Amino acid sequence: MLTSYQLESPALSWGEDGAPHSNQFDDVYFDKESGLEETRHVFLKNNQLSGRWASLQKNAFVIAETGFGTGLNFLCAWQAFLTEAASDKQLHFISVEKYPMTKSMLTDALKMWPSISHLSQQLIDAYPEVCHGLHRIELEQGRIQLTLWFGEAEDGFAALDADVDAWFLDGFAPSKNPEMWSDNLFKHIHRLSHQGTTFSTFTAAGIVRRGLKNVGFDVRKVKGFGQKREMTVGELNSSTAPLSARMSQGQAWFNLRQDKTSEITKVLVVGAGLAGANTAYALAKQGIKVEVWEQGNCIAGGASGNPQGMLYPKLASQDTPVNRFYLSAYLHATRLYSSLDRHKQFWDACGLIQIPKNDKEAVRFQKLLDEKLYPEAILQASKDREGCLFLPLSGWVVLTQLCETLLSHENIHVCLNTKLESLSPIELDDKTFGWQARSKYQQAPLNDRQACFSHVVLCTANDTKALGVTPKTPDYPIRGQVSFMDIEKAKAACQTIGESADKIDFDKILCEFGYVSPSINGLLHFGSTYDLKDLDDRVREEGHKRNLAILESLLLLPKETFNSEDCGGRVSFRCAVPDYTPIVGPVQSEDVYQQAYSTLTKNAKWQSNEIAEPIKQLYINIGHGSRGLISTPLSGSYIASLITGTPSPLEQKVSHKLHPSRFIIRDLKRSQIL
C-alpha cells in the first residue's frame, strides 16, 4: 500500500548549455542541439503520425509514453497535431513519470526551446501539483488532453483504462534504468493496444525488443537519428491483439466495455445541477452536441444552487481507492475552476482551515502532518490557528455562476421546465441504437428527431428512482439548511458584546462541525444542517440557531452572539449514498446481473469471466452528497470518456468503487437478491 502521496523530484544538474541532466540515472533528458529534431524523427516520423492524422476517421487519437521528463515529446506531438489533423479531432496523450519535475524545473528546462514557447507556457500554467496518481490536463479548449501518471510506470499502466494507437517508448537508456522495462510493463503495453497499434523507441536494446516480441508486437530495427546507428519500431499484429483494453481487470461485473457501433449524434443530459453541468461541459468540449433537460425553472435550482459552496476534500490518513478518487477530483476541480474564472468572478482559491472537532481528530491531524502523507502544496499546518490543518488550494465558488458558465458552451442547449417523463429504447435506423425521451412539459411526437438521442446521462440526484429506468440504488436525501447574515449586522453584534468586528473580516474558509466562508456581496454564508429523514423544504428558525452555534464556535465567539432573526436561509436536499461515494458509470440491468452472477449468493469469493453487458448507451452520475463541487468535474469527464471510448481520467480500481453495479454485486454476495 502507498505510504505517501509525496514523490521525489529528480536530482538535476544543469550543463553549461542549460540542458538538464539526471543525477539519478546519469543521463541527459535531451540533446540541446537536436532535441526537437530527434523527437520528431524517433517518435512522430517512425509512428507515421503525419499520414495517420491527416486521414484520421475516428474522433480521437491516443498516444502513450514511458517517461514524461520535460514534456518535450508531448509538446512536439501537440504542435504537429494542430497542423496535421482536422480541427474536429482530439489528441489524447498519456505519460508516466516516476520523478516528476516541479513547475520551476519544467520552466527552466523548456526555456531552451523558444520555437514552442507558446505551447510550453500553456503546459507550465496547467501543470499539476507533484502528487502521486493520475492527473488530467485539458488544453486548446479540450482538443488536447494530457493524462499524467506520477509514480512507477508499471503501476501507472496497470491503473490505466485506455485504447492506445501509438507508443512513445522513451525514458533513460535501458542500461541505466532496467527496472522500468519489466515483463509486467510489456504485458500492460499489450493490454492497452489494439490491432495496428504502433511503437517507436530510440533504443535497440535487447531487453526492449524481446519484451515487445514476447507480447505479440512485430519488431524491427531501423536507422536511428543522427549518429545513432539503430532504433526500434513495430506494430501489434492481429493474431495477438487483445479483445478490449477497456475490459475490467479481475472483476467482470465492473466491465466498462460497450458496443461502439452506434454513432454519437446528440446526448441528453438530464439535470442542470453540478453533475449535469459538468457532464454536459465535458461532452461539449469533445465536439458533441448536448441537450440538457432541467425540470426546474432555472439552472442549479436544487442542492447545487446554494449561494456559496466550498471545496472541502476531507483527506484521509490511509491510501484507499475512494481517497484516491477524492484527491484526484479535488486537484482536477481546482484546475478547472481556475481556468474557467481567471478574473475571480465566481471562484476564489482563498484556502481552507480545518479545525479538529475533538481530541481524537486533533491526534489524526498531527499524524497526517508528521507522516507527510500529502505534499505541502496540498496539506500543511495552519499558521493562523494552532493544531489545525490548512489546505491552500481550497476555495469557494458561486454555484449558480459556475453552472451557468459550464452550460454556456456553444455545443450545449438547455431546456428549462422540462421534466423527463419516460425513456424508451429505439432503433434510429437499421444499425443505430438510441433513446426516445418524452417530457411532461414538451410532449414531442414519436417521429420528432429532437426527442431522439444516441446516449442519455441521468444526473437526476434524488429523482432518479422515480424514473424507473435504473436498478434500485440505495441513495437517499439529506436535508440541509444554510444560513446567511448581513456582514454589517454580524460586525455590530460582535461590537455589542465587546468583541472586535475584525473577527468577521477573515479571508479563509473555516471548517469544523460546519463551515463559514469569507463574505460575498455583503453577506456571510454559514452552515449547514444535516437532517436525516426530514423532507421539510421550509427554512426553519431552529436550523438558523444550529448554524449560528456553528458560526460562533468557528469564530471563537460566545454563545448567542448572533440573533436568528437576522438570518436568511435556503433549504435543499443532498443526494447521499451509504458508502459516501458517488454512483457514476454505465447503468446495469438488475435482471441480467442476477442471472449472470447468481453464484455469488452461494460463494461470495466466486470470480467470473462472463461479461454482463450494461444497458446500451445509458449512464448515471448521482450521489455526490455535500462534496459535489469536488467530485462532479472529474465524474463528468469520466462519463464523457465512457461515451466516446477515450482514455479514462480514473484509475480502474477507482472506477470500480464508483460503478453503479457495486450495489447489485454487494446484495448478491449478501444473498439479499434471490
UniProtKB/Swiss-Prot annotation:
Source organism superkingdom: Bacteria
Annotated region (FAD-dependent cmnm(5)s(2)U34 oxidoreductase), positions in chain: 270-674
Residue span of region tRNA (mnm(5)s(2)U34)-methyltransferase: 1-237
Disulfide bond entries: none
InterPro entries documented for this protein: FAD-dep_OxRdtase, FAD/NAD-bd_sf, MnmC-like_methylTransf, SAM-dependent_MTases_sf, tRNA_MAMT_biosynth_bifunc_MnmC, tRNA_MNMC2, tRNA_S-uridine_synth_MnmC_C
Pfam family, one: Methyltransf_30
GO biological process: methylation; tRNA wobble base modification
Entry keywords, A to Z: Cytoplasm, FAD, Flavoprotein, Methyltransferase, Multifunctional enzyme, Oxidoreductase, S-adenosyl-L-methionine, Transferase, tRNA processing
Cell location: Cytoplasm
Main subcellular location: cytoplasm
GO CC annotations on file: cytoplasm
Gene Ontology MF: a single term: oxidoreductase activity, acting on the CH-NH group of donors
Cofactor(s) needed for function: FAD
Reaction catalysis annotation: 5-aminomethyl-2-thiouridine(34) in tRNA + S-adenosyl-L-methionine = 5-methylaminomethyl-2-thiouridine(34) in tRNA + S-adenosyl-L-homocysteine + H(+)
Function: Catalyzes the last two steps in the biosynthesis of 5-methylaminomethyl-2-thiouridine (mnm(5)s(2)U) at the wobble position (U34) in tRNA. Catalyzes the FAD-dependent demodification of cmnm(5)s(2)U34 to nm(5)s(2)U34, followed by the transfer of a methyl group from S-adenosyl-L-methionine to nm(5)s(2)U34, to form mnm(5)s(2)U34.
PANTHER family assigned: SARCOSINE DEHYDROGENASE-RELATED, TRNA 5-METHYLAMINOMETHYL-2-THIOURIDINE BIOSYNTHESIS BIFUNCTIONAL PROTEIN MNMC
Matching NCBIfam families: MnmC_Cterm, PRK01747.1-2, tRNA_MNMC2
Family to which this protein belongs: In the N-terminal section; belongs to the methyltransferase superfamily. tRNA (mnm(5)s(2)U34)-methyltransferase family.
Protein name: tRNA 5-methylaminomethyl-2-thiouridine biosynthesis bifunctional protein MnmC
Gene assigned in the entry: mnmC
